[in-house]
Design a protein with these regions (language model features):
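Rossmann-like adenosine-cofactor binding region
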Residues: 78-152
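Glycine-rich phosphate/diphosphate-binding loop of Rossmann-like nucleotide-binding domains
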Residues: 21-98
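General beta-strand structural signal in soluble alpha/beta enzymes
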Residues: 1-4, 31, 125-127
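Alpha-helical transmembrane segments of multi-pass membrane proteins, especially transporters
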Residues: 4, 32-36, 118
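Short glycine/serine/threonine-rich phosphate/pyrophosphate-binding segments
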Residues: 11, 36-42, 63-64, 107-110, ...
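Adenosine-phosphate binding glycine-rich loop
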Residues: 130-194
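Glycine/serine-rich phosphate-binding loop and adjoining beta1-alpha1 elements at the start
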Residues: 1-25, 153-159
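Conserved active-site and cofactor/substrate-binding residues in soluble primary-metabolism enzymes
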Residues: 9, 13, 58-61, 65, ...
């Protein structure tokens, strides 16, 4: 089971809950801080659901490198966007229906004012459980909770599925010693459990 620092199970749980809440096919999805392990996997899983995906980074170079790495591993290249600050990230989410925040602890990637009245945003998910959260205006415990007319999922809201998924995958490994569970397999399992 490949799950470095929980990156596959975290991304899988978040995207599976988004997909359960609403179809992602044809939606524009932005992964904020999409150059880390959770963000890159979330981008791939959003793509599996048929979303048009972009990833942001503070650095265009890092965004380009992550897009290439995602393409090398998953066979599609998300649009790389440099979004150095909150203003640039607010501009990046304009026109998106899905926002997935995968940033580090203690960094707000998107202020509440930048998404609460946006007419196109339908779904927001945040993997950061420690305040300040990655997306302002949602709570870590949100699990498909309506906020400002949008569906919000917080880190603890997806955490239950993440732990259930992790246990199920580890249990599956005891059934046969010759299997490999990577991002795609783990995501399929997350969808079944969501």
């Amino acid at each position: 089971m490949l799950d470095s620092n929980g990156s596959n199970t975290t991304a899988a749980a978040g995207v599976a809950l988004l997909a359960k809440a609403k179809s992602l096919a044809g939606k524009k999805a932005i992964v904020l801080a999409g150059t880390g392990p959770v963000g890159m996997r979330a981008a791939a899983m959003l793509h599996i659901e048929g979303a048009e995906v972009a990833i942001t980074s503070r650095s265009k170079q890092l965004a380009d490198a992550a897009s290439k790495a995602i393409n090398d591993r998953f066979g599609f290249a998300p649009t790389p966007i440099e979004a150095f600050d909150n203003e640039a990230r607010a501009a990046a989410v304009k026109g998106a229906q899905v926002v997935f925040a995968a940033g580090v602890i203690g960094v707000t990637l998107l202020d509440e004012k930048d998404w609460q009245n946006d007419p196109t945003i339908e779904l927001v998910a945040d993997c950061n459980a420690q305040p300040p959260l990655g997306i302002g205006g949602i709570e870590a415990i949100d699990k498909a909770k309506e906020r400002h007319g949008k569906i919000a999922i917080g880190a603890l809201g997806l955490g239950g599925l993440k732990l259930k998924l992790h246990r199920a995958c580890v249990g599956q490994l005891f059934e046969s010693a010759d299997q490999v569970l990577d991002a795609e397999n783990i995501y399929a399992q997350a969808k079944a459990l969501a």
